[in-house]
Amino acid sequence: MNKTQDNLKAAFIGESEARNKYTFYADVARKEGYHYIAKIFEETAENEKYHALEEIKMLLGESSTRANLKEAVGGENYESEDMYPRYAKEAELEGNQAAAILFNQIAKIEKHHRDRFQVLLDMVNNEMVYKRDEPIKWKCSVCGYVYKGTVLIFRMNKPKSSDYFKEQSPFSD
């Protein structure tokens, strides 16, 4: 990795961290009655989001949903099976039970994220995003049109790639 790539990675991490901190700061300001300050924090957080997006695009280049899902499965697996369990053990050894509980809870959530991404990756790999073996309800997120069937039928001249239709979630949440 060259210096510019290192800088793009560091900038992405910094902008991402700033976005989350500013979102947190906005909540604090709002709780304290500083609504205008909260709005400024939120606006700045949104700016930081776009800075980070430009940096990650430059760093990673073009990718596909399939590749992104595969990377997401790997990342969530690392977090759920290695990172957070290790952090929990370290917190326990240091006597910080609250942090240990938090890390263990997050590990479970990351496992759920991994499993969800894996289901979606399997759906993409098996070309089952817009078709099912059994009829399901498909709903247009723009006009509210609901259709029940095994294959999504597009309405209102909306292209498939526009994500106007969503299915009933294949997940239990």
Which ranges hold each PLM region?
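Non-heme di-metal
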Residues: M1-D173
